[in-house]
From Swiss-Prot:
A Pfam family annotated for this UniProt entry: Rrp15p
Gene Ontology biological process terms, A to Z: maturation of 5.8S rRNA; maturation of LSU-rRNA
Homology family: Belongs to the RRP15 family.
Gene Ontology CC terms, in alphabetical order: preribosome, large subunit precursor
Organism of derivation: Danio rerio
Protein known as: RRP15-like protein
Superkingdom classification of source: Eukaryota
InterPro entries noted in UniProt: Rrp15 (IPR012459)
Length: 249
């Protein structure tokens, strides 16, 4: 706008002609200088605007980063609430929790190491026979347990049947059943099997080899055991003698 305004050249016919012409020429020169300065300012403003726009196009987050940097750069007193990122108390709490976790982990590792001092992993190749024996023992134990359960249930059912339809007596019998009874049954299964085996072994052996042989016999019965043992043999021996005598006759 300053460039469009042109001052007219006015000539005043007066005694001071030289002074008026000089002042007008000075005014024209100052107006031209101001026009040039205004144009330079507009050009520089346009260049600055273009440079800002170009920077924003190249890095659109630059303004946001500057704003956040200003906010974070402010120093806030301890009495006022601050951003959690700058809260030093929270950092101290996190550091304390981290130390506690590490301490607990060390204690657990120490405990596990103490428990695993004498533990060894079994070798399947070398300890194959030992493992088989253990499997057999475990199988026998399981079979014995289920047999004991079956016998215990059978005994309880028989006692309930003997009572009849009395609910009071049934409840009394069921309340009288305890763990001790079951343990006795569990122990008695093995004992009963051993006793049966011993009885069979004793029956198959010769009576002379028994521990109680001739313990309860009196002197007058000393030959009965011998007759019972060898009775069949004497009869067999006598029969051919009789046959021989009949032939001689």
């Amino acid at each position: 706008m300053a460039a469009l305004a042109v001052k007219p050249h006015v000539v005043v016919e007066d005694g001071n002609d030289d002074v008026s012409e000089v002042s007008i020429s000075n005014d024209e020169e100052s107006g031209a200088d101001s026009d040039h300065e205004g144009a330079d300012a507009e050009n520089s403003g346009d260049e600055d605007g273009k440079s800002d726009e170009e920077q924003n196009e190249e890095n659109p987050n630059a303004g946001w980063a500057e704003a956040m940097a200003k906010v974070l750069g402010k120093k806030t007193p301890d009495t006022k609430p601050s951003i959690l990122l700058k809260n030093k108390q929270l950092d101290k709490i996190k550091e304390k929790e981290k130390k506690e976790r590490l301490e607990k982990k060390k204690q657990l590792d120490k405990k596990r190491a103490w428990e695993n001092i004498c533990r060894e992993k079994p070798d399947v190749v070398q300890d194959r026979e030992h493992e088989r024996n253990l499997q057999r023992v475990a199988t026998r134990g399981v079979v014995q347990l289920f047999n004991a359960l079956k016998n215990h249930q059978k005994n309880v059912n028989e006692r309930i049947k003997e009572v009849g339809g009395s609910e009071r007596k049934k409840s009394k019998i069921l309340s009288s059943v305890s763990k001790k009874d079951f343990i006795d049954v569990l122990r008695g299964t093995d004992v009963a099997v051993k006793k049966e085996k011993e009885i069979k072994a004793e029956k198959s052996s010769w009576s002379v080899l028994k521990d109680d042989f001739m313990m309860g016999a009196s002197m007058k019965d000393w030959d009965k055991e011998r007759d019972e043992d060898g009775g069949g043999g004497e009869e067999d021996e006598r029969e051919p003698a009789q046959e021989y005598s009949s032939e001689s006759d």
